[in-house]
Amino acid sequence: MSSHIHFQEKITHTDYEIKMISSGDNFPSIDISESRLHYLLIMIRSCIDIQSIKKELNWTTIELDRHINTLLKEGLLKERKGSYFPACMVITAHEGKELYNLCEPLITPTLQIIEKHSKQIITLCQKIDTFKQLSIETCSLLLYSGILLDFGQINNVENNYLKSERPLRNNKRYYYSIQEKEKINEEAFGIYGNHYLDLGEIQICLYGNKRYTTTNLITANKEMLEEYFQQPVLDVNQFKKQLVQKFVSSNTQIDVPLHLFYEKVGLHKDSKPMTPLFKTADLIILDEIASTISEDLITLFQENEQYLKRYYLSSSYAKEITYEEFFIWWYHFFYTKVTDELIKNDIIKKLDQENQTYLVLQ
């Protein structure tokens, strides 16, 4: 028997991440990874014949038809002239490299935009207590990547450049992507992202590109907490909330085990707090910080629109998704590449923890 691995077998032996941009209750009614439906979408896109797909996924004809209908109903698959196409952005390793290459002409102008507004950015930072208590360097990944380019900027990009609503899928509006994952300890394509755990009046947030492979307060589970503190944990979120309340309260005596735990999950470094703590009023100033570069960034995208659309129209994405959906996922590659350049230029100081934990108090 040949040792050659069929293409469809290679797909099922590759790791993928499902990414989504949504708000409120705008999300799919199904988890496509649970039923291996992401493999079906990738194989259809790779022009693998139906019989080979059935064989590889070990489905009957009835099961395959049911799964196809599920994806059609969900708006993640579409049919045109008897052929099926994914209706979300599937990004293979090869396409990821192309998307990074596509960023190149925009990187230097973006670094210049940030430099142009750097004094204004620092002035605004000085209005926020946590930036006075911690050095800007300590918070630089969150500030220059998260706030300036990623979650602090993306609404501006949608509203003022794309000027369109998110795609409507089964009465829900959201962006959706399946991304090939090459590195075990890093998120797909090394893309930076934001994650938060809402505990009522406290939000624990985490920014970085190794959020799910590092020890942090969001991913800490029941077993880890019980093993570390040697006590039963009945309600994980309530326990985390109490840990954060002790961290926030300046008059609480912190014992050695708790202090070491704060170090372990990235709240402390070298015995000192290193976690930004934002109050509700600070969020308005964070918006102002993001807005410093907004206009110039939108102009840059408008000036490069034909360049970006040429790639889009020449790719398979043109028959699968809108330019707007293509752009928003490309934008993630773009701000990640800008972030990596800012790290190289020592504007962003890389932390030992890889990610930046921060807290928001309502």
For the regions a language model picked out, list residue spans one by one.
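Short capping segments at the starts of secondary-structure elements
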Residues: R45-S52, Q231-Q253
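Short amphipathic alpha-helical interaction segments
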Residues: L57-E74, K78-E79, S249-K264
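Minor-groove-contacting beta-hairpin "wing" of winged helix-turn-helix DNA-binding domains
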Residues: G82-C88, D270-T280
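Short, amphipathic alpha-helical interaction segments positioned at domain boundaries
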Residues: M89-I122, L277-K309
